[in-house]
Amino acid sequence: MARDLAIDLGTANTLVYAKGQGIVLNEPSVIALNQQTGDVLAMGQEAWQMIGRTPGYIVAVRPLRQGAITDFDVTQRMIRLLLQRAGVSKFNRPRVVICVPSAITEVERRAVTEAARRAGAADAQLIEEPMAAAIGAGMAIHEPVANMVIDVGGGTSETALIS
């Protein structure tokens, strides 16, 4: 049960990293919802496999588009399920860092942190995706040298010069 988690909340896939454990989840960013009841039936790979194989009232929802939240409620529910799968409980609320595209607005940034807090995070901080990629690649981000980062994702692609 990790107290520190990092989430790459991607348009196509979502990864969860737990401090000391590495990547503990790598799932498609999709949820299967029962439109009649509002219940979440599945998330990730399980929801992906349901596409086209369920009655019409069960829909697959991708709550992010181009790295920004398009459905706040579904995003919150997806983050809650991700936290549960990572071993988080009501009594074990983690600190969370979430990767976001550099170009999202301040309102979109607040939506991400609020969704994470409502989903069960004790604290939620954001890091821009190119910076997270540079840190993850072991680049010396505090050194007086320039590093170019190209982050290609399912919904956004970014290029950054980090020095």
Question: Which residue stretches match the model-derived regions?
Answer:
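Nucleotide/phosphate-binding catalytic cleft detector across ATP-hydrolyzing
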Residues: M1-G154, A160-S163
